[in-house]
């Protein structure tokens, strides 16, 4: 049944040592790809460290131009204190790309999504990516994270040590 739908994929190989990449699966009947690019996340303190690229796909959905960024931030391996700065680097890359889009296209429709390995209330998401959980708190440079309200209700996408995390997010 999937083959009949003619789904397509946008994908780039990333430098991740485990071979994990991100991609965007789409139906060309509804979404037309105009351009795509991959952005590396580098660690200035460790030139040998590698993680997944972040994917930017610009296209048309129902005749409207949209930008979709797909990310899979570094894991929490080694604990939050050790691994948090790596996710902050990933968030900074995402935010930099978003800022570039907004500078060129102030009314851009942007979707930032993926497995962030952090919750909606973590600093990497709130501070580095500059997201807020309530529409009324939106300011010119902020993104809206609808997943924050789910998280605050105890809804998650990952159970770990008898608690829910909401790492899989869609931010607009």
Model-derived regions: residue spans:
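Metal-dependent phosphoesterases centered on the DNase I-like endonuclease/exonuclease/phosphatase
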Residues: 86-172
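Flexible glycine/proline-enriched surface loops and loop-helix/loop-strand junctions
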Residues: 53, 74-79, 151-154
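Structured beta-strand-rich core segments of catalytic domains in phosphoester-bond hydrolases
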Residues: 2-65, 71-73
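Metal-dependent phosphoester/phosphodiester hydrolase catalytic core
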Residues: 62-92, 96
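N-terminal start-of-chain detector that recognizes signal peptides
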Residues: 29-32, 39-42, 83-84, 139-145
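Short flexible/disordered coil segments
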Residues: 40-50, 70-77, 127-133, 167-172
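Second-shell loop/turn segments in exported
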Residues: 1, 11-12, 43-45, 77-87, ...
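Extracytoplasmic/secreted cell-surface and envelope-processing proteins
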Residues: 18-21, 77-80, 119-124
């Amino acid at each position: 049944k999937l083959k009949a739908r003619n789904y397509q994929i946008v994908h780039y190989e990333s430098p991740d040592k485990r071979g994990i990449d991100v991609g965007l699966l789409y139906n060309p009947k509804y979404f037309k790809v105009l351009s795509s690019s991959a952005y590396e996340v580098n660690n200035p303190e460790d030139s040998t460290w590698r993680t997944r690229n972040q994917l930017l796909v610009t296209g048309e959905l129902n005749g409207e131009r949209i930008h979709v960024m797909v990310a899979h931030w570094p894991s929490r391996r080694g604990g939050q204190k050790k691994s948090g700065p790596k996710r902050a680097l990933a968030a900074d890359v995402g935010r930099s790309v978003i800022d570039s889009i907004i500078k060129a296209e102030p009314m851009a429709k942007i979707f930032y999504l993926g497995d962030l390995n952090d919750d909606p209330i973590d600093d990497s998401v709130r501070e580095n990516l500059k997201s807020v959980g309530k529409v009324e708190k939106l300011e010119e440079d902020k993104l809206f994270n609808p997943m924050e309200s789910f998280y605050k209700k105890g809804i998650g996408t990952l159970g770990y040590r008898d608690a829910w995390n909401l790492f899989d997010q869609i931010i607009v």
